[in-house]
Amino acid sequence: MTDAAPNQPVNESQELSKSFEPAEIETRWYDEWAKRGYFDAGRHVETGTDPQPYVIQFPPPNVTGTLHMGHAFNQTIMDGLVRYHRMLGDDTVFVPGTDHAGIATQIVVERQLDAQKVSRHDLGREKFVEKVWEWKEQSGSTITGQVRRLGASADWPREYFTMDARMSRGVAETFVRLYQQGLIYRGKRLVNWDPKLLTAVSDLEVQSEEVDGHMWHILYPFVDGPQTIIDAEGNTVTLRGMTIATTRPETMLADGALCVHPDDPRYKHLLGKLVELPLCDRNIPIIADDFVDPDFGTGCVKITGAHDFNDYACALRHDIPLIVIFTLDAHINENGPKQFQGLERYEARQAVVAELQAQQYLVKVEPHKMMQPKGDRTGVVLEPMLTDQWFVAMSKPAPAGTLNPGKSITEVALEAVADGRIAFYPENWTTIYNQWLNNIQDWCISRQLWWGHQIPAWYSEDGQVFVARSEQEAQEQARAAGVAGPLTRDPDVLDTWFSSALVPFTTFGWPEDTPDLRRYLPSSVLVTGFDIIFFWVARMVMLTMHMTGSVPFKHVYVHGLIRDADGQKMSKSKGNTLDPVDLIDGIDLEGLVRKRTFGLMNPKQAGAIEKATRRQYPDGIPAFGTDALRFTMAAYATLGRNINFDLKRCEGYRNFCNKLWNATRFVLMNTEGHALDGDGGELSFADRWIVSQLQALEAEVERGFADYRFDNVANALYRYVWDEYCDWYLELAKVQIQQGTPAQQLGTRRTLIRVLEAVLRLAHPVIPFITEELWQKVALVAGKRTAGAVASVSVQPYPRANPQAVDAEAEAAVAELKSQVEAVRALRGEMNLSPAQRVPLVAEGPTDVLSRNAPYLAALAKLSEVEVVAALPDAGAPVQVVGDARLMLHVEIDVAAECARLDKEIARLEGEIAKANGKLGNASFVERAPAAVVEQEKARLAQFSETLEKVRGQRVKLGA
């Protein structure tokens, strides 16, 4: 696509600069693309056509700071797909957005206030929320800037924030409808509670950590005096009471019962009897339930329904009282004995254990490893807490009048994957998705925070609840119900993942039936890390299908997580994070140290982090540019695996960009000023070969995009550009331009520029900036745009393989030429010739092939001449055999000196072989050395042996 305009961001008369400097190019071209509207839906497609939509939604980054390497990886994959489909002619929509990230954002802003010795309670809710909005504006613009730096061709007019007015409307509408359908309800339930944040947290936000704890064994005396039981060995045993074991003795203050298995013969006669609750003026019953393991410990457990998830279910089944013993900040409340009231939970533990021991209720204490649940945001040990919360019913059948009546939202989500409407890449994630949905619990969606979507529910003074889209609507409901007086809004906010789950359809205008919603839902693919399949992916499927009847996306591409070079998770506390912008622009050592040691949760870690950073990056991080970073990310994108990120890979792909730049300079120098549009000219076998290879590249790249194998795309581009086009074809083209006829020169020049132009289009989705800059110059010469016209590679047709251009004969001819060149280079190495020394080659074999290849051999193997003979002379020189050809360098040598040199080399190699055999024959070395070191030594031995055989062969040819 081209459109005439006077302003072209490239000086067409200026020569391409000598070196690739990405910074200036990136800023200039991103602004230009956005200004021209290439990223906007519908703007880049041909008028009068009805292209198919191709839609990708950002997984919205949290507005809690800056993008990390995982975001850079995600953006590379998503933008690569979008640019590819834009060039295919699809109507691409790449929807950007950011997430309000309730808990995470509130923590960040509260920390800022803490530094000023101010709490959110000092400010009040309204002022605090204002502060968060201020911070969001600052952080959100930083993130947007970073996304642009990564080259994301996003449809910026569609940018959203999950608390924008239009998004908030969709959230409220969804909540109200689900409530009216009986699929959202409020109830007193046991939840994971963060006593620092004072909010419920999702099961998925719980991180379990193994710790060294204790098991306390406590005696609960029988109220009726000692009882007898028959133990497992058949002995009659008299018990003063029941002994239970617990890792949390402080919670015994809330016990409601003791429980045994109903089929445990030891305790059947004790069912219904009462025991004393130590330290409390209460008696509790002995009950039976199948959940008890009779073979674990004494086969008796305590039931603390308000502070343990297993106990909670048991207590409900048996109507056992739920006694809450903790305040919301985890101190003993008024339900505990007076002596413990007001104590923090761990202080209470010490006091309870001391009192149990003093009153002889403590039987014994044992060390015990245990899993401790912690909040992933605060690291605080979570407390099961009985509170009033809002829930989404995950397994309840939807009522009549909904889009899927009689089916739960979970059933519908499972069916969408089972029948192929949604496909996972790689496929194994389907199993994980299904396992989670088949074991799902109702979703607690309320959070006791100030930042987020406030729950659209209002309460009357007598406790009636009115769920409505607005306070006015709630008032109308109250009046209709005969309720007078003020209404108070529920202070809680919704789980961040609730609003995020609505993104696939609320971003396109739902609940209105908009043209965008009809055209762009479902998205084509969701690109995401496996860590949020449950948090986000499954919930998007459930809610999108329930509210709209459509799947949210057709494909889910699941990638691994970015780790450091040693495979460690990147985290601020480890000091091993990398900012993608630092890899693009570079950062000096002092700046990197400051960035890694600033704002640590534990400032004591700063010294170790600084030391490690100075050791790892003594010169800081060089500027690689966006294209090199993107190429690196694409090359790492194997299906589903975690990625150990190594900066050396970035350096390699920066070198690739330099190679492409320099190749373009060479091509332009040899093609500019020549009339290369139209047909004509004579194509050599080398010209036909590089065009034939291009077809294979185009097919491989197309297959890679279709299969989400971005590593294959990147590797195919790298191999073709570096190995085939630059290292071989450019060298062959030099020969053809210098020695060919005018028709041959024209054919080669046309091939040089046309293949390069196609390569730039092929590589554009991966490395957009350098390809745009180079294409502007190359396209003029290749006849793909006219001088003065505005055009962009980003909206050019994507190259497709042409089977008619595959040339097996040319492929075979170049393969043979390559083998001959490499054979002559091997001869030069064997004869220890310097690179500058030009020597003649004598060749025996097929005359037509050798004569055709002679000028290329002379140029690429640094030969003074190539003589084709009927038979090689008996000169005692080494010979290389390539197919039917025999090749020999005709070099006059001092035989005595060469014999002496070879004898010396033989002695050296024999010494190396003896040393290697000595090591490998040493059992201690083989057993104790790392396997990699042993394998390396074996490889050295094999290499020395192979070289020795060749050198001995040369020595034999020279005689005594």
From Swiss-Prot:
Its EC number is 6.1.1.9. A motif ('HIGH' region) lies at residues 61-71. A motif ('KMSKS' region) lies at residues 569-573. One of its GO terms (molecular function) is valine-tRNA ligase activity. The keyword Aminoacyl-tRNA synthetase applies. GO terms for biological process: valyl-tRNA aminoacylation. The keyword Nucleotide-binding applies. It is found in: Cytoplasm. It comes from the Bacteria. PROSITE patterns: AA_TRNA_LIGASE_I. This is Valine--tRNA ligase. Catalyzes the attachment of valine to tRNA(Val). As ValRS can inadvertently accommodate and process structurally similar amino acids such as threonine, to avoid such errors, it has a 'posttransfer' editing activity that hydrolyzes mischarged Thr-tRNA(Val) in a tRNA-dependent manner. The gene is valS. It holds the Pfam family tRNA-synt_1. ATP binds at K572. It is an enzyme of class 6 (ligase). Belongs to the class-I aminoacyl-tRNA synthetase family. ValS type 1 subfamily. Gene3D superfamilies: HUPs, Isoleucyl-tRNA Synthetase, Domain 1, Valyl-tRNA synthetase, C-terminal domain. Residues 893-958 form a coiled coil. InterPro entries: aa-tRNA-synth_I_CS, aa-tRNA-synth_Ia, Anticodon_Ia_Val, M/V/L/I-tRNA-synth_anticd-bd, Rossmann-like_a/b/a_fold, tRNA-bd_arm, tRNAsynth_Ia_anticodon-bd, Val-tRNA_synth_C_sf. Monomer. It catalyses: tRNA(Val) + L-valine + ATP = L-valyl-tRNA(Val) + AMP + diphosphate. GO terms for cellular component: cytosol. CDD domains: Anticodon_Ia_Val, ValRS_core.
